C-alpha cells in the first residue's frame, strides 16, 4: 500500500474511492458505492490485510456498514447492521465515526445520541458495556 495513495470520500451520494500511484500526478476515481445513500464516515483499516469501511445511513433501511477487501474496487454490506440491544430500547440514528478497535476484527463506532461502542464486524462478541452491537 506504500506505493500508492488511497483516499476515501463520504458524500450524500455514497462513498467514492480515489487512488493514485507515486508520484500522484492524477487520481482514478471510483464510485459511488452505496449509491444515493449518505456516507458520514470512512475508515482505511491497515491492521493485517487492508480493508476499507464506510457507514451508510438509509432513511428507509437504516444503518449499514460497507466493507471493501479489495481496496475500494467493490464494497459489500457486513453480515449484520449496527444496532443497540433490544433491551436498551433505543434506535440507532447515525454512525458519525468509525475506528479500528483493539482486536484484529473489532470496529468501533461513534453514533448519534452520544454513545460509542463496537464489536466484531461479523456481528458477534460485543466489546463495549451494553451500548452498541456491530
Describe the residue ranges of each PLM region:
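Extracellular glycan-interacting surfaces
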Residues: 1-134
Amino acid at each position: 500500500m506504500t506505493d500508492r495513495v488511497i483516499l476515501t470520500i463520504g458524500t450524500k451520494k455514497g462513498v467514492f474511492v480515489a487512488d493514485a500511484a507515486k508520484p500522484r500526478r492524477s487520481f482514478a476515481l471510483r464510485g459511488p458505492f452505496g449509491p444515493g445513500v449518505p456516507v458520514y464516515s470512512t475508515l482505511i483499516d491497515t491492521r493485517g490485510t487492508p480493508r476499507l469501511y464506510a457507514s451508510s445511513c438509509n432513511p428507509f433501511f437504516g444503518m449499514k456498514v460497507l466493507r471493501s477487501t479489495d481496496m475500494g474496487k467493490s464494497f459489500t454490506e457486513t453480515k449484520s447492521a449496527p444496532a443497540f440491544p433490544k433491551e436498551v430500547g433505543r434506535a440507532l440514528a447515525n454512525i458519525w465515526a468509525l475506528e479500528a478497535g483493539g482486536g484484529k476484527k473489532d470496529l468501533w463506532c461513534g453514533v448519534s445520541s452520544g454513545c460509542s461502542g463496537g464489536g466484531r464486524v461479523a456481528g458477534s462478541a460485543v466489546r463495549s458495556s451494553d451500548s452498541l452491537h456491530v
